[in-house]
């Protein structure tokens, strides 16, 4: 290559390098900007769920009569708060179909645990799916058929009890997460427990009921 040709190409090479460097710096600035960082965090946090968790409404239930709610069984028979009187009742509000396997395992466990299917204690799982939709879960996990399940298809009861703003809700404002409400024989809420870890709670809940029943 002649010296003359080399000198002609050098400015263009320099310009190209400068443009690449400028574009790279610009990308890094945009990527690290607070607005972009916050947007990314918002997507990662709570699977895009709006609003911060708030359990005040749920916690306020303790010591009060269970609010008047309506739930339906697979045959569309309606159940209200009055129907839960007469024995200790554990209401397990959860995400249903979308919460596999954690919620399903808990529901199936309640169904097979004699302690929660007696004349003293009953466990009722509440999902926001329809009864027809829930049949797909039973087909996949037949053990779920033993669980007593009621349906809150419009999430009305879940909203009324404060289930949609808990820490465990992965779709905050729309669906419950993994929350328990213990109601005594007189229909008074004695204990609430929201579990973001979605662990099995049979033993803990049974012991809590024994403690409350002393």
Roles of regions detected by a PLM:
Residues 145-148, 163-169, 173-181:
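Structural micro-motif
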Residues 75-77, 186:
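Residue-level recognition of short loop/turn positions
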Residues 70-71, 182:
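Hydrophobic beta-strand positions
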Residues 1-65, 214:
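N-terminal targeting signals for export/organelle localization
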């Amino acid at each position: 290559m002649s010296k003359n040709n080399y000198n002609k190409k050098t400015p263009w090479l320099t310009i190209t390098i400068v443009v690449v460097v400028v574009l790279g710096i610009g990308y890094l600035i945009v990527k690290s900007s607070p607005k972009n960082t916050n947007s990314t965090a918002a997507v990662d946090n709570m699977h895009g769920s709006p609003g911060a968790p708030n359990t005040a409404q749920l916690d306020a239930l303790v010591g009060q009569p269970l609010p008047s709610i309506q739930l339906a069984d697979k045959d569309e028979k309606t159940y209200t708060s009055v129907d839960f009187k007469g024995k200790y009742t554990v209401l397990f509000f959860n995400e249903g179909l979308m919460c596999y396997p954690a919620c399903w395992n808990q529901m199936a466990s309640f169904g097979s645990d004699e302690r929660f299917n007696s004349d003293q204690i009953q466990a009722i799982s509440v999902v926001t799916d329809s009864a027809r939709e829930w049949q797909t879960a039973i087909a996949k996990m037949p053990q779920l058929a033993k669980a007593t399940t009621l349906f809150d298809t419009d999430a009305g009861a879940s909203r009324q009890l404060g289930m949609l703003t808990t820490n465990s809700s992965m779709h905050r404002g729309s669906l419950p997460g993994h929350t328990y409400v213990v109601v005594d024989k007189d229909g008074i809420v004695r204990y609430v427990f929201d579990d973001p870890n979605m662990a099995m709670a049979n033993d803990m809940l049974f012991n809590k009921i024994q403690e409350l029943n002393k």
